[in-house]
């Protein structure tokens, strides 16, 4: 099979596949089923066997980190591993709505990174990102960045990043300290596009999340009810936007999911887009789509015209 296209993750210099793997669906809580050992092995080894070399997770994702450690520690040299910090130190079983608030104190940042290292059975993380887009003032008051940089000096973290969104994202970029930004972006969610470009021009690597919006645009609306309540409003808004905009003439035989993924890969500023699934068949389909590369330039431009930035 043809190799996946790759890109340099900004100033990190890491050569990452343009299709990455988002491991949230391994969480095993919050409406996500707990995978058996066989299921976990199939999906995670399938990720690496399919050529993907970038895996993103978080302590907030239930059992995700633990499962990655169990299944992939023996293949650690084959992939780049990204996680988050500032997350509450909790048992994986605690549901989202019962978890403690995020805490960006130096002590909690360090405790979280060290917990991630233990869970994933590794002595370093390639990228650690602050989760849930904390305000710049919070990071400065807590001296949070200094703690991540200390962990970097110790060799436990290679590069630091921000999982950021509007309205804080512009401030995060202006701080000038982040090697990587993880930002939501898709055909139906383009409001961060200018900031993505700004961050890329400043030399940061760009990790896209939500590039296919979990396929909620084309599924029965009742499927959205199966997701945690905190995800549902955004999913409904994206589905509504998709349903009211006709692009059938642009699909050229592709499924909407395929088109969405190739649209995301077509953004010239992106380094990798993380797509999650616990289904090996869906994983294989995602790999096959990514192998096709970006959309033709004229199709990409027309899709942008039909889904303008609000």
Locate the predicted segments by residue.
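Short hydrophobic/aromatic-enriched beta-strand-loop microsegments
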Residues: 78-81, 178-186, 292-300
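Active-site beta-loop-alpha junctions enriched in small/polar residues
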Residues: 24-26, 58-60, 84-88, 130-133, ...
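Glycine-enriched alpha-helix->loop->beta-strand junction motifs that scaffold or abut catalytic
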Residues: 77, 174-182, 200-206, 269-270
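N-terminal binding-site loop/beta-alpha segment at the start of enzyme catalytic domains
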Residues: 1-83
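Short catalytic-loop micro-motif centered on adjacent basic/acidic residues
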Residues: 53-59, 158-161, 180-183, 272-274
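Structured C-terminal cap/extension of enzyme domains
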Residues: 48, 53, 194-310
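Glycine/proline-rich, positively charged
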Residues: 45, 92-187, 194, 266
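Conserved, mostly hydrophobic/aromatic
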Residues: 9, 21, 47, 55, ...
């Amino acid at each position: 099979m043809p190799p996946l296209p790759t890109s340099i993750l900004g100033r990190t210099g890491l050569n990452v596949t343009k299709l990455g793997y988002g491991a949230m669906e391994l969480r095993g809580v919050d409406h996500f089923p707990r995978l058996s050992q066989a299921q976990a092995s199939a999906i995670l080894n399938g990720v690496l066997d399919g050529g993907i070399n970038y895996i993103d997770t978080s302590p907030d994702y239930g059992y995700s980190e633990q499962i990655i450690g169990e299944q992939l520690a023996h293949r650690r040299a084959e992939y780049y591993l990204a996680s988050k910090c500032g997350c509450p130190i909790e048992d994986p079983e605690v549901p989202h709505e019962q978890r403690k608030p995020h805490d960006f104190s130096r002590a909690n940042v360090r405790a979280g990174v060290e917990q991630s290292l233990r869970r994933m059975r590794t002595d370093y993380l390639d990228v650690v990102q602050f989760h849930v887009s904390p305000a710049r003032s919070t990071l400065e008051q807590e001296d949070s960045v200094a703690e991540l940089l200390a962990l970097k000096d110790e060799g436990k973290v290679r590069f630091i990043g921000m999982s950021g969104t509007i309205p804080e994202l512009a401030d995060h970029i202006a701080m000038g300290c982040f090697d990587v930004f993880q930002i939501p972006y898709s055909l139906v969610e383009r409001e961060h596009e200018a900031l993505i470009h700004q961050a890329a021009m400043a030399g940061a690597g760009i990790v896209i999340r939500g590039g296919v919006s979990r396929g909620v645009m084309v599924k029965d609306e009742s499927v959205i009810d199966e997701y945690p309540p905190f995800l549902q409003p955004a999913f409904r808004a994206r589905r509504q936007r998709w349903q009211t905009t006709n692009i059938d003439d642009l699909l050229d035989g592709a499924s909407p999911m395929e088109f969405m993924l190739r649209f995301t890969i077509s953004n010239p500023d992106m380094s990798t887009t993380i797509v999650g699934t616990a289904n090996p068949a869906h994983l294989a389909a995602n790999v096959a789509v990514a192998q096709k590369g970006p959309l033709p330039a004229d199709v990409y431009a027309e899709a942008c015209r039909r889904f303008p930035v609000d």
